[in-house]
Design a protein with these regions (language model features):
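Short acidic-glycine-tyrosine-enriched beta hairpin
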Residues: 111-131
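Conserved short histidine dyad/triad with adjacent acidic residue
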Residues: 56-63, 74-91, 131
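Histidine-centered metal-chelating micro-motifs
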Residues: 84-87, 105, 125-127, 131-136
C-alpha cells in the first residue's frame, strides 16, 4: 500500500489522481503565444511571446483560466526573436531565466547611473535576479531563443519598469 508522507492541501483532499492529472498537466502545444503579455511588448525592440504554464508571471494576467494556478512560484516559457528583448525592470521577488534553446544576453543595471553588466547565456545556463535589482535581456544572436522564467511568488506584481513612462502605464496591457 502506498502512503503519502506529506498532507495534501485542504482543497485537494478529496481530489482523485485522475482529476489531479487533468488539473496539473499543461502542454506547450495547447498554449497560445501571448504577444501582448507585457506593456513594453508593444514597442519595437521589446516584442516577445509569453507561454504561461503556472500562474501569470510578471504579466499580471493572474486570472488566465488556462494556466495551472500559481502557488509559491510561476513558470513561463518566453520566445524572443533576434534583436528583441525587454525593458529594464525589477520585481518584488526573485526572477530566474533558464535558457532552453538559443542564446540570451542578460544584464544587471546599476540604479541611478544606468551602467550595465552583460552575460550571455546558452542552453542549460541560468541567471537568478534578486528582488529589487534592475535587470533585463536582449536576444542579440541570429536565432530565436526559448527560455524558462520563474518568479518566486504565485501572483507577483506587474513588472516594475525602470523607465518612468513605462512604469506609469505598466498595467495598460491588462
Amino acid at each position: 500500500m502506498t502512503t503519502a508522507r506529506h498532507q495534501r492541501p485542504a482543497e485537494l483532499q478529496d481530489t482523485s489522481i485522475d482529476e489531479l492529472a487533468e488539473k496539473f498537466v499543461r502542454r506547450f502545444g495547447d498554449i497560445d503565444a501571448d504577444w501582448e503579455a507585457f506593456e513594453d511588448a508593444k514597442i519595437d525592440g521589446y516584442r516577445r511571446a509569453q507561454h504561461r504554464f503556472i500562474g501569470g508571471g510578471g504579466s499580471g494576467k493572474h486570472d488566465d483560466p488556462n494556466v495551472i494556478k500559481g502557488g509559491a512560484f510561476t513558470l513561463s516559457i518566453m520566445f524572443v526573436n533576434p534583436g528583441e528583448g525587454n525593458a529594464a525592470h525589477t520585481h518584488e521577488v526573485e526572477e530566474v531565466f533558464f535558457v532552453l534553446k538559443g542564446h540570451l544576453k542578460v544584464f544587471f543595471e546599476e540604479e541611478g547611473t544606468g551602467r550595465q553588466i552583460h552575460r550571455t547565456l546558452g542552453p542549460w545556463e541560468c541567471v537568478s535576479c534578486p528582488p529589487g535589482v534592475v535587470h533585463g535581456y536582449i536576444n542579440d544572436s541570429l536565432e530565436p531563443v526559448y527560455f524558462q522564467v520563474m518568479l518566486g511568488k504565485g501572483k507577483p506584481e506587474t513588472m516594475g519598469y525602470a523607465d518612468e513612462k513605462l512604469f506609469e502605464n505598466r498595467d495598460g496591457h491588462l
